[in-house]
């Protein structure tokens, strides 16, 4: 007996809308506490990142993409200006558990890279954690290289932060 695989879940990417930043903060806090035991200081960091994005948003140089399927939030990512010249920073990649393995993360990262090139950036930098194995695989697949590691316990657990970079 053979079974046909169900068709892949379809999704679209869109730019952020009112209410998205609060939802991004909420989902990050819930998921990272559940999966990695991050404490409320992580939620505080995400709140600052999303608030800074809204306060300083430059549509010519920055974006936040939301992946969704029929209005259901599947994931998100941000690209923001870094302090370094001609460098963008990839922030807040997150894919809901139900959407993992469907290409959502790959599509979000590709959107960042494509936009960064169009905007004239020469590099994209990011900071991630060694425990985020799925995200790390996606970054490596997209051509990012790990350039530095730094142990920390900023969110109540021992972690290894990783700095990655992509030359465009």
What is each PLM-predicted segment?
Residues 99, 103:
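Glycine-rich phosphate-binding loop
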Residues 11, 15-98, 109-111, 115, ...:
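Acetyl-CoA-dependent GNAT
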